[in-house]
């Protein structure tokens, strides 16, 4: 007779979880940041608010964003005028868009990841789907399973409305699933569409306009699993450890509320200051076991909440400008895509490392950190180990 302990041992993978493939996708509608203020004030019938428009222009100029992708086109917005009006009841119209489009965009990214992975999709055992919008039953995880034609026995986990830290959360969860289930192959998808947060300008709620200047749409997918099959599966990064923490004295710093008017975001405190003040503690806890204390000796993937967060983190830790190069590149090319950002940055980094002929997927370095920041203030910290290119 076998013991529970023996069964337990047999169920577990031998090695650490690895990221085996990454795929990304965006809507086709590309928005130029330099002309966005004119477009935004025109489409929301707010051109009379000239002072506010100048403020918004300055926000966009300082955003360090070059372009973004958005599902919401001028045509869609003209058909749904309530989405454009500040604080107009519009949740039904928004929901109708996102419950369809979030899984569809997720499917595009997933197909690219599955193709790179090179294994039949029937080998996917788990799905972790993450989005800030479009709560529905059955959810986006179910829709994705149907769209991709995955097995009905695939084990699904749906994460709604976590916010910008959740790119770290999905990696943490997938790591545990892969390491605790022998042979598990976890499809992770973060799909974010801003149709639920888009709204017209308000001179009394400038914090809501920060989001209008920063947020973009995008989806990213990964295949995560332990014990890669030699010659078949080619890991990109190994997942070493993962942690989550709430920052002290940060309650209410970022919050979002789903109401009849859509998902409203509020930035209530000095978010860049709170993050930069506390980030070293998370780094020390994560890297002390590895004997690493030089933050310039590791590669960096940080959620680009906005340029001020990156600037203050860089300053506080004395990071060389090139450390956040991949992070800033994604912010410039796509804006803040909430949970999907850090997956895009991982993709950018491994591609740039290969293109530049560097020795590892992590810019030629062995160890790295991935940070997610978001409502709470919640910080996700993932320690990564790169793979030889």
UniProtKB/Swiss-Prot annotation:
Pathway: Secondary metabolite biosynthesis; flavonoid biosynthesis. Keywords: Acyltransferase, Flavonoid biosynthesis, Transferase. It catalyses: (E)-4-coumaroyl-CoA + 3 malonyl-CoA + 3 H(+) = 2',4,4',6'-tetrahydroxychalcone + 3 CO2 + 4 CoA. CDD domains: CHS_like. The keyword Transferase applies. The primary product of this enzyme is 4,2',4',6'-tetrahydroxychalcone (also termed naringenin-chalcone or chalcone) which can under specific conditions spontaneously isomerize into naringenin. This is Chalcone synthase 2. It comes from Solanum tuberosum. The lineage of its organism: Eukaryota, Viridiplantae, Streptophyta, Embryophyta, Tracheophyta. The gene is CHS2.
